[in-house]
């Protein structure tokens, strides 16, 4: 990290003063004394870079519109909370190339350009840190890298998108349809005006890309390899069916180490009541991690919001300020192959009027009768599901998580 030994305070710049950026400034301000004590030096916000002015903000005097003013200064850490993968990419690359550590909550940028940006950070003896990119305020990136470093991570299953979990919770609890629940989410500030990244599973796809790459020892798994199915086709009838077999419906992002290649996908899933993810409702996130020594552990908390996300960002600021940048983890530059979606062996629940037909047609697979119209079929390859459904006249099927 450039010039740290020459400064009495650690100067930082916040790039983008929206929901998360403003939360970072607020968190650093209200916890200033505590943070200084823990770091041993003051964390000083020197600049806030944004195209807008914020005359009502107590940080208004720190705002600049000039990127050159920021990057030509003595800042040691840049907080990238711009979002997207264009301007944020340019600024992040510029900062890292100058030896300025970057911390971010930008899952799109991390999932698409992570290998390149981590490499640039290593080459310039600085950090690229992204705890807040997955799970908002939930600690998950650092635990995977550090606390669970002695484990082979065999499985990750998570509810990693608060918008979709809120919508599904409202559909179940209030008995309303998808469109009404989406409008409620937008009215309450839990969904964007254009919610496609959330409801189509793209946001979850990016997040499981990051978690999978870390679990896969830095062998990069690009988001565009990962099959992602959203929630817009879920109906109230689906929830009635789920309830009848003791399940709830969640949008699950899944990683499994696999015997040959990793298994990674995002899909609406019937979650059994015995699973800890069953009780995760509203905008909350939860991530189940399974390690070969650990067994199972669940990380739970607020997956979005100004201060929860800012909390994770500020944790990275402190790590960049106190740690040795040689601890950077490497990601491979090229994406590694994962199991093709059609070849994935999954547990599914098939809904049919005549369960016996399913059992007969699914010969060779382990089956379990869950109700008069529900059959659990274990380990069936995705490419075989369509023929099973069409041959038996089944109504529908969905992934199952016990």
Segments (PLM) and residue ranges:
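NAD(P)-binding Rossmann-fold cofactor-contacting core
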Residues: 30-57
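A conserved regulatory-domain signal marking ACT and ACT-like small-molecule sensing domains
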Residues: 317-319, 323-402
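Rossmann-fold NAD(P)-binding glycine/threonine-rich loop
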Residues: 89-94, 107-134, 141-144
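Catalytic, metal-anchored helix/loop core of enzyme active sites in primary metabolism
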Residues: 153-157, 165-168, 172, 184, ...
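Glycine-rich Rossmann-fold phosphate-binding loop(s) that bind the pyrophosphate
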Residues: 17
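N-terminal Rossmann-fold NAD(P) dinucleotide-binding loop
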Residues: 21
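Rossmann-fold NAD(P) dinucleotide-binding segment
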Residues: 67-105
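Substrate-binding/catalytic subdomain of NAD(P)-dependent oxidoreductase enzymes
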Residues: 180-279, 284-286
């Amino acid at each position: 990290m450039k010039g740290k030994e020459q400064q009495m305070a650690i100067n930082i710049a916040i790039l983008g003063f929206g929901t998360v950026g403003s939360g970072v400034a607020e968190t650093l301000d209200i916890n200033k004394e505590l943070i200084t004590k823990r770091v041993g030096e003051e964390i000083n916000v020197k600049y806030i870079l944004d195209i807008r002015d914020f005359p009502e903000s107590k940080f208004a005097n720190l705002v600049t519109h000039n990127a050159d003013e920021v990057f030509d200064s003595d800042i040691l850490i840049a907080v990238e909370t711009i979002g997207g993968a264009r301007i944020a990419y340019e600024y992040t690359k510029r900062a890292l190339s100058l030896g300025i550590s970057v911390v971010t909550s930008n899952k799109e940028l991390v999932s698409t350009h992570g290998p390149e940006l981590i490499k640039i950070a290593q080459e310039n003896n600085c950090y690229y840190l992204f705890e807040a990119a997955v799970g908002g305020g939930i600690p998950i990136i650092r635990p995977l890298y550090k606390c669970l470093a002695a484990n082979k991570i065999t499985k990750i299953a998570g509810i990693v998108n608060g918008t979709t979990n809120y919508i599904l919770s409202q559909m179940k609890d209030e008995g309303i349809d998808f469109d009404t629940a989406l409008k409620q989410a937008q009215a309450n500030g839990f969904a964007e005006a254009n919610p496609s990244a959330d409801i189509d599973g793209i946001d979850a796809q990016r997040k499981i890309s990051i978690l999978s790459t870390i679990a896969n020892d830095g062998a990069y798994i690009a988001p565009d390899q990962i099959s992602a199915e959203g929630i817009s086709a879920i109906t109230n009838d689906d929830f009635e069916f789920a309830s009848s077999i003791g399940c709830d419906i969640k949008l699950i992002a899944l990683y499994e180490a696999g015997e040959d290649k990793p298994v990674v996908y995002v899909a609406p899933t019937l979650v059994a009541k015995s699973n800890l993810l069953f009780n995760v409702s509203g905008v909350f996130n939860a991530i189940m991690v399974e390690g070969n020594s650990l067994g199972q552990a669940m990380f739970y908390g607020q997956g979005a919001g100004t201060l929860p996300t800012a909390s994770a960002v500020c944790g990275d600021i402190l790590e960049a300020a106190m740690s040795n940048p040689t601890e950077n983890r490497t990601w491979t530059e090229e994406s590694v192959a994962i199991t093709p979606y059609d070849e994935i062996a999954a547990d599914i629940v098939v809904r049919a009027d005549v369960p016996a037909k399913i059992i007969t047609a699914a010969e060779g697979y382990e089956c379990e009768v869950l109700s008069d119209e529900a059959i659990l079929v274990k380990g069936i390859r995705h490419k075989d599901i369509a023929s099973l459904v069409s041959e038996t006249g089944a109504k529908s099927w969905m992934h199952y998580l016990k």
